[in-house]
Amino acid sequence: DSGSAIVALTNDRDTSYFGEIGIGTPPQKYTVIYDTGSSVLWVPSSKEQDFIEATDETDNVFLHRRFSFWLNRNVDEEEGGELVFGGLDPNHFRGDHTYVPVTYQYYWQFGIGDVLIGDKSTGFCAPGCQAFADSGTSLLSGPTAIVTQINHAIGANSEELNVKFGLTPEQYILKGEATQCISGFTAMDATLLGPLWILGDVFMRPYHTVFDYGNLLVGFAEAA
């Protein structure tokens, strides 16, 4: 089939999005996180089993070598999200996607510009930073210096935040217990590639995300 295939996703409290895969003949079903931040497939298995591993097989199942994510923020709705192999679902985005070239193929990594808090430049990424869109990360991770400023701004006045694409407080603050809210930003400095942002589910919920393997591009459009 050279068209596309749609996988329904389950939203687990806005922290993870799961879907089913089938392995073997007849297929045995497993529930997995479709993780764009990992090159490894992890599934439960029996110990000391005989198996044959195929590590470099290309089937060209789909005409377009791309896949796209839509993650639903509303945990009360039956439809938790959607992963489309080989195409896009126009029901889940508005307007055109903005595409950026992949700069490091081990991850879906790309360059980003300055980081703004409200309408003020932090200057932190003015010379340029790197980021990658990671469907397997719940939060939005970034360097400690700038994330500290962001979390301080959230606590002070909860202004609208912009990180190249705008995020509102409703999008980056997570629900905890009845009287508790959790910041969707977490600090991370361990990188050999310079300042790095991981744009996890907090970012991918408001922005429909396309991973174009054929052209080595990542695209974002407003989710619908």
From Swiss-Prot:
Gene Ontology cellular component annotations, sorted alphabetically: endoplasmic reticulum; extracellular region; membrane; protein storage vacuole
GO MF, one example: aspartic-type endopeptidase activity
GO biological process: proteolysis
PTM: N-glycosylated.
Keywords for the protein's UniProt record, in alphabetical order: Aspartyl protease, Cell wall, Disulfide bond, Endoplasmic reticulum, Extracellular matrix, Glycoprotein, Hydrolase, Membrane, Microsome, Protease, Secreted, Vacuole, Zymogen
Activity-pH behavior: Optimim pH is 4.3. Active from pH 3 to 6.5.
Pfam families named among the record's database cross-references: Asp
Activity control summary: Inhibited by pepstatin.
EC top class, as a word: hydrolase
Domain annotation Peptidase A1: ranges: 1-221
Localization (cell): Microsome membrane; Protein storage vacuole; Secreted, Cell wall; Secreted, Extracellular space, Extracellular matrix
Cysteine disulfide links: 125-129
Tissue-specificity statement: Pistils.
Top-level division of the source organism's lineage: Eukaryota
EC number: 3.4.23.-
Residues of the active site: 35, 134
InterPro entries reported for this sequence: Aspartic_peptidase_A1, PEPTIDASE_A1, Peptidase_aspartic_dom_sf
Subunit structure: Heterodimer of a light chain and a heavy chain. An intermediate form is produced first, and undergoes proteolytic processing to remove the internal plant-specific insert (PSI) and the propeptide.
PANTHER family to which the protein is assigned, alphabetical: ASPARTIC PROTEINASE A1, BETA-SITE APP-CLEAVING ENZYME, ISOFORM A-RELATED
Role noted for this protein: Aspartic protease with a high preference for bonds between hydrophobic residues.
Family statement drawn from the similarity comment of this UniProt entry: Belongs to the peptidase A1 family.
Protein name: Cardosin-E
Organism: Cynara cardunculus
